[in-house]
């Protein structure tokens, strides 16, 4: 089972990966000891910056563009690596610093992992 959670709420009890390209502000590295940082699976810098200019109006297009990015060879390999971690642990928590997880890249990533 995959789950999503804000990194700020993570207590360190479940296997987890950090899905953000940027390290979460105010989080010490030792708080995420044992958590893999999979920054290459996150949206590209240009896509992230474009999306953040108008999140409400651009979310649908952001989803479409991010799905295309996830089809690139490096991202496909990273998806497979994450699936292997999930298989190894039986569960995996997808962590993000996003305040609005439902309208972030994480649900798109989750759908790609379950595909």
What residue spans do the PLM features occupy?
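Residues lining hydrophobic/aromatic ligand-binding pockets adjacent to catalytic sites
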Residues: 1-115
């Amino acid at each position: 089972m995959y789950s999503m959670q804000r990194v700020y709420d993570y207590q360190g009890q479940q296997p987890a990966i950090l899905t953000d390209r940027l390290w979460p502000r105010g989080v010490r590295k030792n708080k995420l000891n044992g958590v893999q940082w999979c920054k290459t699976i996150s949206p590209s810098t240009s896509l992230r910056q474009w999306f953040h200019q108008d999140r409400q109006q651009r979310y649908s297009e952001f989803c479409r563009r991010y799905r295309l990015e996830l089809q690139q060879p490096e991202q496909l390999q990273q998806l497979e690596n994450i699936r292997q971690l999930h298989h190894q642990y039986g569960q995996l928590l997808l962590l993000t610093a996003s305040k609005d997880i439902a309208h972030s890249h994480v649900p798109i990533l989750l759908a790609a992992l379950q595909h």
